[in-house]
């Protein structure tokens, strides 16, 4: 992917916001509980390497990623000795690569442990499916089989056991408690407790501090975003959003009544109006569903008109502006703010998706 340093569209990441969110979370954790920064999916769109550096500076004790490639990227970037856990499935043939790079892997099937050829010890975290329904063992019998299998191979180390809550970001807790009971039952079936027992993502840690166990997987809230709007007013501290998205007007013109813009001619001016073309489109993560949404221009709302194109978007201006004028898509301008939550609400999705969609074509600038 070619990063577009030569067009006026960019993301700003506020390192101080990330540091503040981590520090506020750490102040709530017992000293013996580790905070692991979840930097999967290019750090939820914030940039994996620079975010990891910032998180480590703030006191994060390790990292969680989704795939082995992300873990290797961290190792190659200089995180040589840091704890890294791959949360997703890894192919059996890649186990040795992980072992040689001291990367911990998630395991959720006993047969995956068969016929491994390892040149170094492999650290394993056993995933328990307590009700999420994706990956994980579901019974004490499976747990005992895996524990027995690991005991037969001196190269296998059962480093951790964990689960993931499906409803931690909801105020109603009955399903959460059901998952916890199932996880606890499987956990107590082990003859030897692993070093790391971890269940808490951002939502669980913020709302259910008793779930912290030995480590917390701090993800969405590290970036200053609420796990869900439902719990936003119940959070123990104010989150500081780290990401802002900006662009500039590359063309400004006046439409006459009857003039149309963009594909399908879905927008037609009914009177004289000023419009601007922005150098950002759905290839950058500003998907077509943003049509009809709004941005900030000089602190005023300006609607997106017509269809969002692959590389360009058109907005209706409140008045004439100069080419090169700044446009805020996510962020604050003259005291008014558009958040990732606002965009998610318009799109009918969640803030995670809004930032994860932002492609590598957009350069990230790190401030503070």
Curated annotation (Swiss-Prot):
GO terms for molecular function: alanine racemase activity; pyridoxal phosphate binding. GO terms for cellular component: cytosol. It holds the Pfam family Ala_racemase_C. Transmembrane segments: none annotated. Its cofactor is pyridoxal 5'-phosphate. InterPro entries: Ala_racemase, Ala_racemase/Decarboxylase_C, Ala_racemase_C, Ala_racemase_N, Ala_racemase_pyridoxalP-BS, PLP-binding_barrel. It catalyses: L-alanine = D-alanine. Its EC number is 5.1.1.1. SUPFAM superfamilies: Alanine racemase C-terminal domain-like, PLP-binding barrel. Catalyzes the interconversion of L-alanine and D-alanine. May also act on other amino acids. Belongs to the alanine racemase family. This is Alanine racemase. The lineage of its organism: Bacteria, Bacillati, Bacillota, Bacilli, Bacillales. The gene is alr.
């Amino acid at each position: 992917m070619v990063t577009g340093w030569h067009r006026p569209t960019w993301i700003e990441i506020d390192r101080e916001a990330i540091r503040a969110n981590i520090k506020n979370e750490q102040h709530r954790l017992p000293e013996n509980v580790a905070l692991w920064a979840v930097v999967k999916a290019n750090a939820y769109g914030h940039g994996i390497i620079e975010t990891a550096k910032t998180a480590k500076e703030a006191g994060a004790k390790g990292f969680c990623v989704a795939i082995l490639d992300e873990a290797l990227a961290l190792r190659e970037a200089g995180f040589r000795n840091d704890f890294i856990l791959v949360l997703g499935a890894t192919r059996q043939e890649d186990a040795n690569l992980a072992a040689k790079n001291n990367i911990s892997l998630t395991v959720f099937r006993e047969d995956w442990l068969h016929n491994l050829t390892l040149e170094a010890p492999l650290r394993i975290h056993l995933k328990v499916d307590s009700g999420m329904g994706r990956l994980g063992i579901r019974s004490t019998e499976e747990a005992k089989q895996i524990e027995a299998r690991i005991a037969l191979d001196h190269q296998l180390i059962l480093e951790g056991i964990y689960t993931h809550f499906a409803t931690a970001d909801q105020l109603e807790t009955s399903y959460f408690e059901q998952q916890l009971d199932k996880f606890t039952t499987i956990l107590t079936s082990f003859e030897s407790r692993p070093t790391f027992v971890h269940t808490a993502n951002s939502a669980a840690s913020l709302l259910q501090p008793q779930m912290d166990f030995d480590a917390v997987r701090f993800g969405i809230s590290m970036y200053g975003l609420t796990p869900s709007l439902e719990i936003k007013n119940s959070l123990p501290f104010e989150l500081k959003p780290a990401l802002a998205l900006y662009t500039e007007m590359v063309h400004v013109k006046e439409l006459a009544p009857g003039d149309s813009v963009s594909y399908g001619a879905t927008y037609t001016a009914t009177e004289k109006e000023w419009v601007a073309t922005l150098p950002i489109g759905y290839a950058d993560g500003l998907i077509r569903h943003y049509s009809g949404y709004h941005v900030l221009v000089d602190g005023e709302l300006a609607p997106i008109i017509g269809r969002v194109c692959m590389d360009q978007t058109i907005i209706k201006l409140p008045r004439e502006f100069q080419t090169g004028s700044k446009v805020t898509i996510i962020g604050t301008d003259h005291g008014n703010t558009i958040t990732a939550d606002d965009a998610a609400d318009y799109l009918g999705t969640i803030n995670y998706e809004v930032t994860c969609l932002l492609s590598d074509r957009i350069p990230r600038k790190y401030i503070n």
